[in-house]
Amino acid sequence: MAHYLMHGTLHATVYEVDKLHSGGISGFFGKILANVEGTIGIGKGVTQLYATIDLERARVGRTRIIKDEPNNPKWYESFHIYCAHMASNVVFTVKDDNPIGATLIGRAYVPVEELIRGDQVDRWVEILDEDKNPIEGDSKIHVKLQFFDVKKDSNWNMGIKGARYLGVPYTFYSQRRGCRVSLYQDAHVPDGFIPKIPLAGGKYYEPHRCWEDVFDAITNARHLIYITGWSVYTEITLIRDSRRPKPGGDVTLGELLKQKASEGVKVLMLVWDDRTSVGLLKKDGLMATHDEETANYFQNTDVHCVLCPRNPDDGGSFVQGLQISTMFTHHQKIVVVDGEMPSGESQMRRIVSFVGGIDLCDGRYDTPFHSLFRTLDTAHHDDFHQPNFAGSSITKGGPREPWHDIHSRLEGPVAWDVLFNFEQRWRQQGGKDVLVNLRELDNIIIPPSPVMFPDDHETWNVQLFRSIDGGAAFGFPETPEEAARAGLVSGKDNIIDRSIQDAYINAIRRAKNFIYIENQYFLGSSFDWSSDDIKREDINALHLIPKELSLKIVSKIERGERFTVYVVVPMWPEGVPESASVQAILDWQRRTMEMMYKDIIQALRAKDREEDPRNYLTFFCLGNREVKKSGEYEPSERPEDDSDYIRAQEARRFMIYVHTKMMIVDDEYIIVGSANINQRSMDGARDSEIAMGAYQPYHLTINQPARGQIHGFRMALWYEHLGMLDDTFLEPENIECVQKVNRVAGKYWDLYASELLEHDLPGHLLRYPIGVSSEGDVTELPGTEFFPDTKARVLGAKSDYLPPILTT
């Protein structure tokens, strides 16, 4: 049957099944299940029917469970489904849930051919068995479907069209106007680092300093300090730049929070309870979160610190529940405080929030210099972080692992949305109700209100997005209808906020010229990976972001227009690079890149163009290499012989860890948050995440390129990574720009990987060390099977024992 590209939005309604014969599960499997239920005391012999929606084999929707309606289950549920899939059928599967999985009742098929032109299909469809024969009793399912092609969407390729843009639709939080946003590159930027970057209106870009601002915000709070983190470490200090000291700046984070709590400020912390500490990953050098130490530190103090496991929503099976609580994390990184009014004159207070990728823990403090060896006796002497080598320590010396990250401060109405997110999470998992009652403080803390006038050219519109479910957030609606109205997705008995993925999809679809991504991971859209040695349906990394990116590039090639996507990822995901988990993730990353390059090459060939696909999609990593200087820290011990550690120390090089979770579109729109480009972060029912999407309505790419704060921020990042500014960087979509960036990054990679080192690396942006064949296969760069100083394959390796759910 012919496959069609369904790129757009599918509206689907699942009504009911007319009649199911006999009900229940008969035969051999039913007997086994009855024994299991009897033995472990879960479940009873009632039917628990639900339906799923698939585009071929990619699951895109599921209804709630209807209990004890064996003959005529009625769901009446509607779905708004983003799709970017090749499919011949929309498949509806009816299943009976049970404690260890589910039993297939049958499947109904609606050909995509009938939908692709946009016609509405509303009908009863026959339910068939595995052999495509009608099931006993000739049952039918009533469904309604309508497909909306992306190219007919008024926002497709249009960017943000000024005041008419209302934000990402179908989301829990709506767009807020009159906000202020501060963007942070790294935890700290030293004075004089950023050169003059011109902005609109004769202004120049001014960098902000994340940990200084967090320190000030906590220090100046009077009523509340709310913190969530994947990890929070009490022993770090936030102020470390000797040229920018602050009163009390040498105090540790733990002491600062205890001090504020003793002054009567309500200090509440939700820190992920690393319950198994994910045993399979632990030995690969991952996950040292200090959760127990942090909880013990605050015991018997005025600080309320709750270790918060990633509990499943109640709807999953017994097996799924085990998966969620042992495999997934709370990943949001937020600080919410009350702050003084912008003028500083009034006694009134307002809410200020921080959202992004930087946890308040060890290993995170860094500057755009990202030194490997030169801060080991100063800023990093008591904060030496190097989890990629077994047995690494400050006594054995560098290289430490430098940390590149991005964060934001939000002021105005959106700051309250971050506060409400914290309150929802605290009420669900925080235990005691000790939240500040803001109604009682309404004469002190102003209600959500703009902090910028509508005609101020520096105003921002901001929208908050999440990946979270009812297991982690209190007060989600109970029914699918209410959930849909609140911009939530209903699952198989859980309610999910998946708006971060929606925000990325919408931003990519709107994009006109270029996209710049920095992310700790880059894998997904597994429904379209090549299936030579895997069963695609077992992977389930189904989020759409990589596919949306390649389809955007393809659409531009078809129209004869320039478009470039730049992606910066770490050399490898943090951990011992030879380990099974790191190698598995690199393998998924390779498959993702390959899928995208094949799309691009196919589109170029259709236009009879033989061109380097890296002119359209190009991947980078960050690294540093430093010559030895006199007066440097001298370690008292030495790493093991023939280890990655000693080789990296002698070669004086290491990757800069890209922990960022950011996307910039056309210099007019930015997403910053905690969510990685992988299934864990984008799913909604796996890791909990938070992100913001923002733009300045006076700085849009309508008649000329945008030259507001987002443009300045990107140029500052490119200066950090490339060690230079260039006029070609002003228009990243142009062939001159992408070729220059690729050329410079290629040169820097050669210097990084070379035997000898005469000078410091002039910049940090390195070509990601892969090649792309004429067919789109991702190959080794000649002579680069392994990352320098390691025995770790650049292209990764499939793991035979780690389940994909853990590494995707």
UniProtKB/Swiss-Prot annotation:
It catalyses: a 1,2-diacyl-sn-glycero-3-phosphocholine + H2O = a 1,2-diacyl-sn-glycero-3-phosphate + choline + H(+). Its cofactor is Ca(2+). PANTHER family: PHOSPHOLIPASE D, PHOSPHOLIPASE D ALPHA 1. Its EC number is 3.1.4.4. Belongs to the phospholipase D family. C2-PLD subfamily. This is Phospholipase D alpha 1. Hydrolyzes glycerol-phospholipids at the terminal phosphodiesteric bond. Plays an important role in various cellular processes.
